[in-house]
Amino acid sequence: MSNIVLSISTNIQKEVMAYYAANYIERKAAGVIFAAKLPDTSITMYKSGKLMFQGGGAEREAARWGTIIYYWSKG
């Protein structure tokens, strides 16, 4: 399972929310402003501007939005 974190602008945040709107899920964790779940990837956006992708499709989905600043794999 891969974990990837991007640092994104406010404009990209809006694009991400629109793109994954159909996959929206509610997350009540502190600092979370948006979350979505795909069959193979969880996506979490934070107030800090960080966007985290977790799961088998993390690399694929992160590549749509920007340069990876953190990457780690549990394998």
Give names to the regions the model predicted.
Residues 1-41, 64, 68:
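Short Lys/Arg-enriched alpha/beta "domain-start" segment
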Residues 43-60:
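Intrinsically disordered, low-complexity regulatory segments enriched in Ser/Thr/Pro
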Residues 58-75:
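Non-catalytic propeptide/linker segments at domain boundaries
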